[in-house]
Structure formats: structure tokens, C-alpha cells
UniProtKB/Swiss-Prot annotation:
GO molecular function annotations of the record: RNA binding; structural constituent of ribosome
Gene (UniProt): RPS16
UniProt organism field: Candida glabrata (strain ATCC 2001 / BCRC 20586 / JCM 3761 / NBRC 0622 / NRRL Y-65 / CBS 138) (Yeast)
Record-linked Gene3D superfamilies: 3.30.230.10
Protein's recorded name: Small ribosomal subunit protein uS9
Region (Disordered): 124-143
């Protein structure tokens, strides 16, 4: 069995979870088995490209990234994918390249958008009695 240097990271947004496998390769990036260029809708595709464009495509020349994403809606999945890719890149550079390049990547990601590396901790508020939702109340009649 050959030991290819690889790391596994995850990204989350609401109920969407993306797991990225980053390993040495020839620059392939796939999401659920299909190329990254086929991510739909097209407007959200550029959100997935953000971590790639931030650090430059030269860093991806010898790295393969496979992402599996489940749960949530389209937008949540896209945000989970981009977070998994960004975290995977940082982890790969920390483990197999050097600390300086890892710090450069981290700095670039956090200065652009903090959610590329840190998950959004907001969760839905639980429903309470006396109304239809967490804050909404049933209508009150005085007569």
C-alpha cells in the first residue's frame, strides 16, 4: 500500500456538512464526484472558487481535493464546501509543507473572510409555548 500524504477536514454551515480529502496529486478538485466547475447554481460557484482564487492556482498544481457534502440547502452546502477546502489546504500545508506557508494561507483566509476557517456558530432558536415559533406569539383578544 502506497502512503500518499493526505489530510481530512470538514466544514459546516447550519445542517450542511462537507468533508474534504486533500492529498498529493495533479490538481483535481471534485465535489460529490463531479468537477468543481459543475457546482450549481452558477452564482454560488464563485463562492466555492474563493479559497482557490485567494491563494492562487499555483498552490493547487500538485494537490487533489475530493469533497463530499450532505444535508442543508444549496447555499449552506456551498459555504460548507468552501470552508472544508480552505481548512484542508491549511491542514495540508501544516502537515506536509511548512509552518510559514500555513501561516500565510491562514492570514489570507482570515483577512478575506473569517468563515473560511471558523464555523458559523448560529443555530435555530427552539420553539416555545404560547406561539407558533421561537418569538412569534398567538394573537391576543381583549373582547
Amino acid at each position: 500500500m502506497s502512503t500518499v500524504p493526505s489530510v481530512q477536514t470538514f466544514g459546516k454551515k447550519k445542517s450542511a456538512t462537507a468533508v474534504a480529502h486533500v492529498k498529493a496529486g495533479k490538481g483535481l478538485i471534485k465535489v460529490n464526484g463531479s468537477p468543481i466547475t459543475l457546482v450549481e447554481p452558477e452564482i454560488l460557484r464563485f463562492k466555492v472558487y474563493e479559497p482557490l482564487l485567494l491563494v492562487g492556482l499555483d498552490k493547487f498544481a500538485n494537490i487533489d481535493i475530493r469533497v463530499r457534502v450532505t444535508g442543508g440547502g444549496h447555499v449552506s452546502q456551498v459555504y460548507a464546501i468552501r470552508q472544508a477546502i480552505a481548512k484542508g489546504l491549511v491542514a495540508y500545508h501544516q502537515k506536509f509543507v511548512d509552518e510559514q506557508s500555513k501561516n500565510e494561507l491562514k492570514k489570507a483566509f482570515t483577512s478575506y473572510d473569517r468563515t473560511l476557517l471558523i464555523a458559523d456558530a448560529r443555530r435555530p432558536e427552539p420553539k416555545k409555548f404560547g406561539g407558533k415559533g421561537a418569538r412569534a406569539r398567538f394573537q391576543k383578544s381583549y373582547r
